[in-house]
Amino acid sequence: MLNDGMETPRDIIINRMMGMKRARIIYNPTSGREAFKKHLPEVLQRLEQAGYETSCHATTGEGDATKAAKIAVKRRYNLVIAAGGDGTINEVVNGIAEQQYRPKLGIIPVGTTNDFARAIGVPRSINAACDILVEGESVPIDLGRVNKQYFINIAGGGRLTELTYEVPSKLKTILGQLAYYLKGIEMLPSIRPTEVEIEYDGKLFEGEIMLFLVANTNSVGGFEKLAPKSTLNDGMFDLLILKKTNLADFIRIATYALRGEHIRDPKVIYAKANRIKVQTHDKMQLNLDGEYGGLMPGEFVNLYQHIEVFVSKDKAAKMKKKS
């Protein structure tokens, strides 16, 4: 059913009495060259055939997906589906994460890089993503919180993390992770390292860095092995610190990162941590799930199995085996 989700109190009571499941799709109408809008009737039909009373909301600008998710929580939807890129998913998560009642989360990846969807094994095909929503399984996963904001995939700081919004969307679509690699080489000569203090689970790093990453998954900026030991539901972040480097160092480390071998490089610190505190001596932007998240400093806290997300049955079985 295509509507704006404005149920009356009577509708909500009747639906609950009938035991009907309710799904709310929050979608970015501009993502993926507006491809999702063309498939929306099919998606609604699939969900309704699976027993969901379904409605949708098209976002109108920055922050709107967060507002829409908060409304969906208030109206006690069983499932909230984020259809868009990593930015849309991040906004939806920020609307759900701080609430006492948290609906299950579904993902339809129609953005450019779709890092989080790749990490949980949700394919780019809209039909295949719908298969997971109606035939898959929901599993609890960790979330990250920093400075009263939430992230589901990655947080970081340092000029190199700004690659995610420096690289044009068209170039990301055509070249994938190579676009980040090339942009990094272009930017590096003009980048000055930043002096930081990073505390992580009783340890302390002090020195100049090019970037730091706080990862919840293994998929970052199109690189699927940047945090190779990452687990979504273990209550731990993967912390990656790239020390001061020159161009030759960067090219070597980026090449190793394609194979997940960068974590052994002497210019890289890689560790597991539940809580990470970062202090900076200079101005440093905070990047949350590929979007601008304000300025550092910040304290990153892992929220253990804080939200349930739909994945394929195979992926769910693997995650349960690891936990």
Predicted feature residues:
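ATP/NTP phosphate-donor binding region
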Residues: 2, 7-80, 316, 321-323
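Glycine-rich beta-strand-to-loop/alpha-helix junction loops that act as flexible
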Residues: 29, 83-85, 110
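Catalytic core of DAGKc-family lipid kinases
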Residues: 50, 59, 98-210, 214
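Short Gly/Thr/Asp-enriched flexible loops that form oxyanion-binding sites at enzyme active sites
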Residues: 87-101
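Glycine-rich phosphate/pyrophosphate-binding beta-alpha loops
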Residues: 156, 160, 213-226, 292
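Gly/Ser/Thr-rich active-site loops/lids in small-molecule metabolic enzymes
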Residues: 171-179, 228-248
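ATP/nucleoside-binding phosphotransfer catalytic cores, i.e., glycine-rich phosphate-binding loops
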Residues: 200, 206, 231, 241-323
